[in-house]
Regions:
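Glycine-rich segments within core transmembrane alpha-helices of 12-TM secondary carriers
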Residues: 85, 144, 162-193, 213-217, ...
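Hydrophobic core of transmembrane alpha-helices in multi-pass small-molecule transporters
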Residues: 29, 116, 128-145, 264, ...
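Pair of pore-lining "gating" transmembrane helices in MFS-fold secondary transporters
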Residues: 11-54, 252-277
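Cytoplasmic helix-loop-helix junction between adjacent transmembrane helices
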Residues: 134-173
Length: 345
């Protein structure tokens, strides 16, 4: 495996700032949560939810939020967040590269995501709700595209010795957040669709999660601004290159493209599981929306625990030293088995 090779002198001088690294890992967890938190509750929220029927009496009724919404459109709503993230990723990456700053791209992203989450919470006040939901999720995607800066920081702020651990834990944070997001929705199912009324607003099992996401985004901005200190132990300076104390390998384009492709497979499979689980189990087992969100949340909690355990093992044990190709083939085998078991034979 090609990697940056440092002289003993340079390696002794450089240290990974693990305090800032752990903050970056937690921020990746927050990004994962922001992306997936509605995956199981999105269709129930759109197809049948409590909202204001009469502004003067502030009377809430439960019926379809948007009668023109169908399951095909749900696919576009789910995709809109990923599309926004895809557009924003290179922008945040370019911003980070030009300014050598992670702090402000991350803060800006979370502020944009907070606006998107607040918009999602207030869908009941709008007409043409399905389009507003799509726009709200797209805006959230533009915000959480800041994960590009966070992932770059994991590489730039860690020494070659610590890089595997830093990237594994960062990936584990994102995977935990991505898997744990729907679990958060399931926690609030006891509120039901009617929820609690506060003036012109309603806190039910759908909207309270959105307000919580807004609070988490703003809290993340505060944490990054106050406690995050940028340290780039992994960057090779011009002086170090000139002294021949560092050996930097050529960029391996084919390997990078393969890794990007595999990452797409992982995310498509995970998204498929989380989005389809709620409507599928509702039909198969005749569950109520709240039951579907709750029980699928339990299943995903177990799944996320297993995923994080593997990421921790990869960064902390000898498993991380196993040939990377063998590790990828091992993981892909389970994705293939999932497709075989889920196929309607």
């Amino acid at each position: 495996m090609t990697q940056i090779i440092l002289s003993e002198k340079i390696e002794a001088e450089k240290r990974t700032d693990w305090r800032s690294m752990w903050i970056a890992i937690v921020m990746q967890f927050v990004v994962g949560v922001q992306i997936s938190v509605y995956y199981m509750s999105m269709w129930p929220y759109l197809s049948g939810v409590s909202f204001i029927d009469n502004m003067e009496s502030k009377k809430f009724q439960t019926f379809q939020l948007d009668k023109t919404a169908d399951f095909d459109f749900l696919g576009w709503v789910v995709a809109s967040c990923s599309i926004g993230c895809t557009i924003a990723n290179p922008i945040y990456g370019y911003w980070n590269q030009k300014t050598m700053s992670v702090k402000w791209p991350v803060i800006t992203g979370f502020l944009i995501a907070a606006v998107g989450q607040l918009w999602y919470a207030l869908l009941g006040f709008f007409g043409n709700v399905k389009w507003f939901m799509l726009c709200a999720r797209f805006l959230t995607g533009l915000g959480v595209g800041n994960i590009a800066a966070l992932r770059v920081y994991a590489a730039m702020a860690s020494t070659p010795k610590d890089r595997m651990r830093a990237i594994s834990f960062g990936t584990g944070g994102f995977v935990l957040g991505f898997s744990f997001g729907p679990v958060i929705s399931s926690i609030f199912t006891p509120l039901g669709e009617e929820g609690i009324q506060f003036g012109g607003f309603i806190l039910n099992m759908y909207t309270i999660v959105s307000y919580l996401m807004v609070l988490i985004c703003l809290s993340a901005c505060l944490v990054v601004y106050l406690f995050f200190k940028e340290s780039y132990a992994g960057i090779v300076t011009k002086e170090e290159k000139e002294k021949d104390e560092v050996e930097v390998p050529m960029f391996d384009i084919p390997a990078s493209l393969i890794c990007i492709y595999l990452f797409m497979i992982v995310n498509m499979t995970a998204t498929n599981i989380e989005v389809m689980s709620s409507p599928l189990t509702t039909v198969l087992y005749d569950w109520k929306d709240s039951d579907s969100i709750f029980y699928n949340g339990i299943a995903l909690a177990i799944s996320s625990a297993i995923s994080v355990a593997f990421n921790i093992a990869q960064g902390s044990t000898r498993i991380g030293r196993i040939d990377k190709r063998k590790q990828m083939l091992f993981g892909l085998t389970f994705f293939l088995l999932y497709q075989l078991f889920m196929y309607p034979w």
